[in-house]
UniProtKB/Swiss-Prot annotation:
This is P2Y purinoceptor 1. One of its GO terms (biological process) is cellular response to purine-containing compound. The keyword Zinc does not apply. It is found in: Cell membrane.
Length: 373
């Protein structure tokens, strides 16, 4: 949550006072407008839900995301070999989600501690960096998964070479490099700040000092790493749906998995990514250009809505495991097989322990002369 240190000008300050002594009324009105636009900063009015909503969402995301992505990584590493191309992308997506959920306990404590950051400036920067790496890494890997499925559905024969695991590994490495390089400025812009009450805030965007340049950077990343992938995904899904309609794929596994993929990915974008990017941009714009007394109430609403979308943006770490289960190559079948095998192994271990206990107890009974066994 961005803790903006904005000093407020009292509402009772009149135009003549702002213009300064000795000015005519007309000049004082113009001067007062200039003074307000240049020095006035709205003081945010924060409601109680903002301090409880985000930690509640983060707790939910941590529990579900940790369990879901742990199982997914376990499956990909031990039960999904040899990997297909789409399995490579899904493994990297699960890895990005898992790294993000590991950072959530510190953020949960931050909000329960009345947004007083105690972990230092470096940890604050790392926290915000990993969030953005997960955000844009997830978007790019979902784009890769969508393009991969598009090639398999629309050009099943021509794409055989392009769908190989080796190509998917190279593309995944490239995605990680692009994301890390593109998000590295976050390590400069984010950080901690001291409030008037001496508590420490951890900026999720940046301080007012760097706000103008951060807005430009944010718009560039939004266009390059959100808007462009979204257009590509929509194009792939449009062509996939068209191919499914005109090709004879009734009740085939490829048709079913493709439909699940379209539904899940579009849901993630509609619920998590689109609202977050829209409200983040509006919040930054409000901090920069909407600082007048008449706009303060509007800014409060924008800020509150932005906090809601921040929670929604983290939900993708819970939804992605559903994608592996429904749209992955043989993931559901192999998960069922792995759980049955683990269950049988557990039953065998329990039976073995029971037999060992019986063998250990039997001599004692015989030694005591008890033959009731």
């Amino acid at each position: 949550m961005t803790e903006v240190l904005w000093p407020a000008v009292p509402n009772g300050t009149d135009a003549a006072f702002l213009a300064g002594p000795g000015s005519s009324w007309g000049n004082s009105t113009v001067a007062s407008t200039a003074a307000v636009s240049s020095s006035f900063k709205c003081a945010l009015t924060k409601t109680g839900f903002q301090f409880y909503y985000l930690p509640a969402v983060y707790i939910l995301v941590f529990i579900i995301g940790f369990l879901g992505n742990s199982v997914a990584i376990w499956m990909f590493v031990f039960h999904m070999k040899p990997w297909s191309g789409i399995s490579v992308y899904m493994f990297n997506l699960a890895l990005a989600d898992f790294l993000y959920v590991l950072t959530l306990p510190a953020l949960i404590f931050y909000y329960f501690n009345k947004t007083d950051w105690i972990f230092g400036d470096a940890m604050c920067k790392l926290q915000r960096f990993i969030f953005h790496v997960n955000l844009y890494g997830s978007i790019l890997f979902l784009t890769c998964i969508s393009a991969h499925r598009y090639s398999g559905v629309v050009y099943p024969l021509k794409s055989l070479g392009r769908l190989k695991k080796k190509n998917a590994i190279c593309i995944s490495v490239l995605v990680w490099l692009i994301v890390v390089v593109a998000i590295s400025p976050i390590l400069f812009y984010s950080g901690t700040g001291v409030r008037k009450n001496k508590t420490i805030t951890c900026y999720d965007t940046t301080s007012d000092e760097y706000l103008r340049s951060y807005f430009i950077y944010s718009m560039c990343t939004t266009v390059a790493m959100f808007c462009v992938p979204l257009v590509l995904i929509l194009g792939c899904y449009g062509l996939i749906v068209r191919a499914l309609i005109y090709k004879d794929l009734d009740n085939s596994p490829l048709r079913r998995k493709s439909i699940y993929l379209v539904i899940i990915v579009l849901t993630v974008f509609a619920v998590s990514y689109i609202p977050f990017h829209v409200m983040k941009t509006m919040n930054l714009r409000a901090r920069l250009d909407f600082q007048t007394p008449a706009m303060c109430a509007f800014n409060d609403r924008v800020y509150a809505t932005y906090q809601v979308t921040r929670g929604l943006a983290s939900l993708n770490s819970c939804v992605d495991p559903i994608l592996y289960f429904l749209a992955g190559d043989t993931f559901r079948r192999r998960l069922s097989r792995a759980t049955r095998k683990a269950s049988r192994r557990s039953e065998a271990n329990l039976q073995s322990k029971s037999e060992d206990m019986t063998l250990n107890i039997l001599p004692e009974f015989k030694q005591n002369g008890d033959t009731s066994l």
